[in-house]
Amino acid sequence: MNVIMAGIDYTLAPIDIREKFSFTKSTLQAVYNDLLKNENIFGAVIVSTCNRTELYLSCEEGLYINPFELLCDAANFDYEEYSNMHVLRTGVDVIRHLCELACGVKSQIWGEDQIITQVRNAIELAREMNASDSTLEVMFRIAVTSAKKVKTTLKLSSTERSIAYSALKIIKSKENISKALVIGNGEIGRLMASILIENGYDTTITLRRYRHGDNIIPLGAKTIEYVARYEKLKDCDVVISATLSPHYTLEIDKIDRIKYPRLFIDLAVPRDIDPKIKSLDNVELYDLDSIYAGEVDKNRTEQMIQVKKIIDKYIFDYYRWYEYRKRLVLT
């Protein structure tokens, strides 16, 4: 078996570097097509989240290749410039890492639940784009299954340690904040709006299209069209942006000319909010790195021992499958 992975994550690079390696669904197909032109690469899966971008490859036995070089090529960056910001894993270290990743124990917020869906979505998208092979399919399925077992056996996370609740904690620590604007009606945006409403904040959420059936609107939320977001800034105390846009949703040149709130929270990668905004008078800007700073779980060491015990069983199952498949090929 020759599986290799390489990637960049929050432990290796700050958000301004990580966001350069984020891929949209529309760009992934081209990346996969280029990767699979190499006849020695049988399958590829890219896991791209707000905190990491990782490339998993199933290759010809004996082939040595650094997937991070391929990621740099796909993102049109010089590998040498970022060569000290990535990690490379091979063999059993790959599946162990993937299992731990799916369990949430490699996340900035220990044990968070969103990553298991992101891992599942990564393999599903690779399959849809004809990029995965049986080795990666089984490896990702094993990782997701092991994560489900960990989640049902151990209590690793609580709602208070999710990204939205971490943002809420920041908002609650500030005085005189009652009106919030959430930019983005995706999963994180809706969750953020719902949590704000539950905690008594007057909350407005942006919609790209205001037609019945096109958007899910959190109960109790007010709505405005996305194009009206700058005008709405005049009437809010905090703005939270959580979109998948490749461009800034808020630019300093447009904000500087209007009355603006003093608290901005950016939950996106690539970042939604122009980082220059923090240079404005009396403004605080939080991005994912600053939101997660200081998140500590005192029980991690003991919990990690239990997680590894569960994962080991699934890693054994994977290798048993692989050896069985290899014998079938030889007979």
Swiss-Prot record:
Protein name: Glutamyl-tRNA reductase
GO molecular function: glutamyl-tRNA reductase activity; NADP binding
Biological or metabolic pathway of the protein: Porphyrin-containing compound metabolism; protoporphyrin-IX biosynthesis; 5-aminolevulinate from L-glutamyl-tRNA(Glu): step 1/2
Family annotation (PANTHER family): GLUTAMYL-TRNA REDUCTASE
Pfam families assigned to the protein according to its UniProt record, in alphabetical order: GlutR_N (PF05201), Shikimate_DH (PF01488)
Active site positions, chain numbering: C50
Biological role stated in the UniProt entry: Catalyzes the NADPH-dependent reduction of glutamyl-tRNA(Glu) to glutamate 1-semialdehyde (GSA).
Subunit structure: Homodimer.
Gene3D superfamilies: Glutamyl-tRNA reductase, N-terminal domain, NAD(P)-binding Rossmann-like Domain
Residue numbers binding NADP(+): G184, N185, G186, E187, I188, G189
NCBIfam families linked to this entry: hemA
Binding positions for substrate per the UniProt entry: T49, C50, N51, R52, S107, E112, D113, Q114, Q118
Keyword NADP: yes
Site, Important for activity: residue positions: H97
Entry's EC annotation: 1.2.1.70
Catalytic activity: (S)-4-amino-5-oxopentanoate + tRNA(Glu) + NADP(+) = L-glutamyl-tRNA(Glu) + NADPH + H(+)
GO biological process: one example: protoporphyrinogen IX biosynthetic process from glutamate
Domain of life: Bacteria
EC class (word): oxidoreductase
Family: Belongs to the glutamyl-tRNA reductase family.
HAMAP family cross-referenced by the UniProt entry: Glu_tRNA_reductase
Recorded domain comment: Possesses an unusual extended V-shaped dimeric structure with each monomer consisting of three distinct domains arranged along a curved 'spinal' alpha-helix. The N-terminal catalytic domain specifically recognizes the glutamate moiety of the substrate. The second domain is the NADPH-binding domain, and the third C-terminal domain is responsible for dimerization.
Annotated keywords: NADP, Oxidoreductase, Porphyrin biosynthesis
UniProt xrefs under InterPro entries: 4pyrrol_synth_GluRdtase, 4pyrrol_synth_GluRdtase_N, GluRdtase_N_sf, NAD(P)-bd_dom_sf, Shikm_DH/Glu-tRNA_Rdtase
Further facts: During catalysis, the active site Cys acts as a nucleophile attacking the alpha-carbonyl group of tRNA-bound glutamate with the formation of a thioester intermediate between enzyme and glutamate, and the concomitant release of tRNA(Glu). The thioester intermediate is finally reduced by direct hydride transfer from NADPH, to form the product GSA.
